Design a protein with these regions (language model features):
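Amphipathic protein-protein interaction modules
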Residues: 51-95
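Conserved phosphate/pyrophosphate-binding and hydrolysis machinery centered on Walker-type P-loop NTPases
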Residues: 13, 17, 39, 43-47, ...
Length: 116
């Protein structure tokens, strides 16, 4: 499996395979496991999804760092990928982490679809 390099490529691939709703449901499920209730519908537009996720990750980094780390653990975002990011700009960091979260969730959905 080759992971998409951009948010747009990820969404295009998810839509082409008709897995976008499953991606959204996987995100909601993992965020709920981390006790973070994201209030959005499974029919959410990709641009709105990206914005909500970005805002949520930014707030977690700024205000609830332990919950942010717990979320990364639950979603199983690569620790090495996180360590490679530049943490000097929190806004940029939160955007990059949001994409890492989306990529990891996409992996889960894709593998479940492919091998089940």
């Amino acid at each position: 499996m080759t992971l998409p390099a951009t948010f747009e490529a990820l969404i295009t691939e998810a839509n082409n395979l008709k897995l976008y709703k499953k991606l959204v449901l996987q995100l909601k499920k993992d965020f709920l496991y981390a006790n973070i209730d994201l209030d959005f519908d499974e029919d959410i537009l990709p641009s709105s999804l990206k914005l909500i996720l970005h805002e949520t990750v930014y707030k977690l980094i700024q205000e609830k760092f332990a919950e942010y780390l717990n979320l990364l653990y639950i979603i199983d975002v690569s620790e090495d990928a996180i360590k490679k990011l530049d943490g000097s700009d929190t806004l940029q960091l939160s955007e990059e982490v949001t994409f890492l979260i989306l990529k990891r969730e996409w992996q889960k959905v894709w593998f479940r679809h492919k091998y089940s």
